[in-house]
Amino acid sequence: MEDRADHRQKLGRRGEDLACSYLEGMGHVILERNWRCRHLEIDIISMDPDGIHFVEVKARQKNVQAPPQENVNKAKQKRITSAALSYLNSSPLHRNMECFFDVAAITFEGEQACVEWIPQAFIPMYI
């Protein structure tokens, strides 16, 4: 029997797969998935003609009351921003590009999924 942690991990992976497909359909090139630096992580880093996108993916089952994007609170935004700065410092090629902080909120109902794309979900104070 699958435990809760395994279920959440599989749901998250499915959500990230859908988000990548969605982004590629919009013309993005996926640069990184689950990029890590120390204790920080960015779910997806993609690029389009406008710039570089740091994407937080939130996936939930339909029966959960709050929408997935509500989990991207100020503390989470700060961690994503710190991770983005680390990425930009380690990637001189992307350092001078316009940066966007987006959220892919994915709601699953059985095998069906609804992707809500939230471009520029937040604007950090320092980037």
What are these regions (language model features)?
Residues 34, 43-45, 58-60, 104-107, ...:
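Anionic group-transfer/hydrolysis microenvironments
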Residues 61-84, 90:
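Mg2+/Mn2+-dependent nuclease catalytic core
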Residues 37-40, 111:
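Short acidic/glycine-enriched loop/turn segments that link adjacent beta-strands
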Residues 90-127:
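Domain-level recognition of nuclease-like catalytic cores that cleave nucleotide substrates
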Residues 30-32, 54, 101:
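Hydrophobic residues on conserved beta-strands that form the core of alpha/beta folds
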Residues 39, 52-54, 98, 115:
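Structural motif
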Residues 23, 42-65, 80:
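Conserved catalytic cores of phosphodiester-cleaving nucleases, focusing on short active-site segments
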Residues 1-33:
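Acidic-basic catalytic patches of nuclease active cores, encompassing PD-(D/E)XK
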